[in-house]
Structure formats: structure tokens, C-alpha cells
């Protein structure tokens, strides 16, 4: 199975906002992360853990977001995506096209929600 079959549309922001604004958006939308995008390309990712580590600080997302984004292509297999998540200790992967334009996001939760689509061999060898 390929990433494009399970990926979702990401929630993006295109301007530098405060952590308070970020927390409000994530809370109201039930999101675990936001992607900071410029000209269609992901420039940073901020996740709930980043907010917790910086709780109460008057900062903007640009100062704490992860800028070294690990991304995948829509044609990447779910197995490869899981391996990348495990190796890098991350739960979400932005999905980009051949021009590095953001086209989706894949999370561990997306994979878990679709576990019935995989056979037992996939997870348990």
C-alpha cells in the first residue's frame, strides 16, 4: 500500500503566529500538528509536543518549529514510511510531490485507523 492511499490534507498556516494562536487552532481543530508553508512548500512543522515544551513562553512558531522536515512522496510504501518514522522517532510525515510542494500528511494515527487494510504479515512478520 502506498502513502497516497492513507494521507490526509494537512492544516497549514502561511504566517508566523504566536504559540497561543497556534494552540487555539490546534485545540479547536483537534490537530496534532500544523505545517508552516511558503509558496506551497513546507518550511516547518510544529507539533503538540513542541507546544508543551514551550508552554507559557511568549514566542512565535518560527522560533520553535522544526525546520529540518523529513518528508515522503505519495508513492512511498507505508512500510517505508513506518520505517522512517521509527528511525527518526516521529509520528507524522509531510507528503510532497516531485517539486517539493506539499500535497498531504501521513501520521501514525492514519495508519492505525486503517489497520484492517493490512494483513497480519505486514506488522508481525
Where are these regions (language model features)?
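Active-site hotspot residues in diverse enzymes, especially metal/ion-binding acidic/histidine motifs
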Residues: 19
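Cytosolic beta-strand hydrophobic patch enriched in CBS
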Residues: 13-15, 32-45, 72-73, 91-105
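Tandem CBS (Bateman) regulatory domains
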Residues: 1-9, 23, 27, 45-86, ...
Amino acid at each position: 500500500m502506498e502513502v497516497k492511499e492513507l494521507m490526509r490534507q494537512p492544516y497549514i498556516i502561511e504566517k508566523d503566529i504566536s504559540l497561543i494562536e497556534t494552540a487555539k487552532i490546534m485545540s479547536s481543530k483537534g490537530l496534532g500538528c500544523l505545517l508552516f508553508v511558503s509558496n506551497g512548500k513546507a518550511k516547518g512543522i510544529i507539533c503538540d509536543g513542541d507546544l508543551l515544551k514551550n508552554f507559557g513562553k511568549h514566542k512565535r512558531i518560527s522560533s520553535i518549529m522544526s525546520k529540518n522536515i523529513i518528508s515522503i512522496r505519495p508513492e512511498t510504501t507505508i512500510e517505508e514510511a513506518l520505517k522512517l518514522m521509527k528511525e527518526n522517532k516521529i509520528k507524522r510525515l509531510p507528503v510532497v510531490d516531485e517539486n517539493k510542494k506539499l500535497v498531504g500528511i501521513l501520521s501514525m494515527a492514519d495508519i492505525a485507523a486503517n489497520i484492517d487494510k493490512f494483513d497480519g504479515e505486514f506488522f508481525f512478520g
